[in-house]
């Protein structure tokens, strides 16, 4: 099921332009993004974090959603890099209760789940030479 019609917003849109937590999340995702090129089974990854695969229709290679609080969903959106453009891992949020969450809490959930996803990458690629970040979680 796609997410057309759902309002997807960034942490910056929740907290405002000067969001320190958006910078924290961006930095954490940039350091971990390369590892997600090793994901072979997106459905398996979604199950591993208790989420689901969702097509957002925004040019992503894959995206997962996870309800982190009643009425609050986080979307992990991955685009593989190529010769012309670097890959990216982004996070968006939606839900009727998004405004009751603090940016600090949302950032913490994001980093927690991204680290958990790195464990999946490590466990499902035992013989691969993975990025160092996979071995630090």
Where are these regions (language model features)?
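Short, surface-exposed, charge-dense and proline/glycine-enriched linear segments
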Residues: 32-39, 85-96, 118-124
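A recognition module on extended beta-rich or small alphabeta surfaces enriched in W/G with H and D/E
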Residues: 95-125
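Amphipathic, interaction-prone secondary-structure segments
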Residues: 52-80
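Short, highly charged C-terminal tails/helix-capping segments
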Residues: 124-137
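Negatively charged, low-complexity tracts enriched in Asp/Glu with abundant Ser/Thr
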Residues: 7-62
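Intrinsically disordered, low-complexity regulatory segments enriched in Ser/Thr/Pro
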Residues: 77-105
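Conserved aromatic-histidine-acidic binding/catalytic patches
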Residues: 30-33, 64, 98-101, 105
């Amino acid at each position: 099921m796609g997410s057309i019609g759902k309002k997807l917003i960034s942490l910056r849109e929740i907290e405002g332009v000067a969001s320190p937590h958006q910078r924290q999340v961006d930095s954490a995702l940039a350091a971990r993004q390369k590892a997600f090129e090793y994901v072979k089974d997106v459905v398996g990854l979604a199950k591993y974090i208790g989420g689901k695969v969702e097509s957002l229709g925004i040019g992503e290679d894959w995206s997962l959603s996870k309800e982190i609080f009643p009425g609050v969903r986080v979307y992990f959106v991955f685009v593989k890099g190529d010769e012309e453009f670097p890959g990216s891992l982004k996070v968006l949020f939606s839900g009727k209760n998004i405004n009751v969450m603090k940016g600090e809490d949302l950032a913490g959930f994001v980093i927690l789940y991204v680290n958990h996803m790195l464990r999946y990458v490590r466990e499902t690629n035992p013989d691969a030479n993975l990025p160092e970040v996979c071995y630090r979680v």
